């Protein structure tokens, strides 16, 4: 049986560049990735450099709330 708080949780990473520009006419949406993080090793918000298909470059993707 599972315990109350799981150590490994699923998080959603969203492109900070797409959100900051306000979805202008050039971009068709916001890039999102789904990944997992270990709550004990990374208690703060996760930020990774991933490829954004809407910006056509590698940008910082930050963790968002569900």
UniProtKB/Swiss-Prot annotation:
UniProt KW keywords: Chloroplast, Plastid, Ribonucleoprotein, Ribosomal protein
Pfam family, one: Ribosomal_L33
GO molecular function: structural constituent of ribosome
Compartment annotation: Plastid, Chloroplast
Keyword Cell inner membrane: no
Listed GO biological process terms: translation
HAMAP family referenced in this protein's UniProt entry, alphabetically: Ribosomal_bL33 (MF_00294)
Protein family: Belongs to the bacterial ribosomal protein bL33 family.
Protein name: Large ribosomal subunit protein bL33c
């Amino acid at each position: 049986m599972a315990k109350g708080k799981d150590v490994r949780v699923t998080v959603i990473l969203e492109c900070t560049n797409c959100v900051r520009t306000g979805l202008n006419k050039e971009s068709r949406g916001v890039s999102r990735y789904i990944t997992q993080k270990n709550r004990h090793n990374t208690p703060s918000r996760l930020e990774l450099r991933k490829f954004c298909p809407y910006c056509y470059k590698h940008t910082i993707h930050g963790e968002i709330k569900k």
